């Protein structure tokens, strides 16, 4: 299903259900701003999804609507997860897909954190 990054937030998306505890996840981190869990279809040795707790469809929605404190808290959470996974020294990749052309599959902002191996160019 194509994701419209300008559409209203859909509370029935899978990440909203994970945030509400309705669907289990392999959680690796949680704070007041974000939750992080292992991707169920990993594309790298380490593939973690970092999801803000706020109701944001995409990076565009988040960057335009979230308060500065929430943006900072989420960005710091991404960094904390990378450090906890031991990814800083060997290196890692961050990815946020936005909309249909960007390959977004879930209408809730999330960052893919890839690592644990040499990643392609």
Where are these regions (language model features)?
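HIT superfamily nucleotide-processing domains
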Residues: 1-121
């Amino acid at each position: 299903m194509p994701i419209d990054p300008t559409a209203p937030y859909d509370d029935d998306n899978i990440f909203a259900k994970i945030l509400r505890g309705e669907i289990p996840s392999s959680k690796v981190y949680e704070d007041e701003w974000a939750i992080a869990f292992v991707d169920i279809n990993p594309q790298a040795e380490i593939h973690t999804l970092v999801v803000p707790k706020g109701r944001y469809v995409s990076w565009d929605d988040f960057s335009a609507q979230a308060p500065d404190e929430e943006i900072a808290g989420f960005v710091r959470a991404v960094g904390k997860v990378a450090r906890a996974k031991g990814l800083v020294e060997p290196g890692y990749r961050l990815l946020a897909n936005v909309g249909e052309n960007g390959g977004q599959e879930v209408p809730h902002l999330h960052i893919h954190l890839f690592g644990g191996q040499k990643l392609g160019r």
